[in-house]
Amino acid sequence: MVRLPLTPAEVERGQRLGALLRRARGDRPMLDVALAAGVSPETLRKIETGRIATPAFPTIAAIADVLGLSLDELWSGVNRPAREPLAS
C-alpha cells in the first residue's frame, strides 16, 4: 500500500495535537503516561513532537483517556482554524 504524502494542513494538525497532548501531560513522566495508555514511550514522543501527524484513533483515545481529556475537547483543540492561537 502506498501512502500519500501528508498535506501541510495535516502536518499542522499533527503539530497541534502534539502540543495539546504535551500541555495536558504537564509534569507527568512520558513513560508513565505511555504505559498507562498501552503505547510505547517512543510512540508518545513522536506524537507529541508531531513526527506522527496522523496517529491511529485508538492510540489517541487511549492517551486522551489517561490524560483526562474528552475526545470532544481534543477534537476541538486540534481541528480549530489554523490562524487561531493555541490555548495555554
Where in the sequence are the language-model features?
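Residue-level signal for the short linker/turn that defines the boundary of a DNA-recognition helix
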Residues: 27-29, 55-58
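DNA major-groove recognition helix of helix-turn-helix/homeodomain DNA-binding modules
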Residues: 58-73
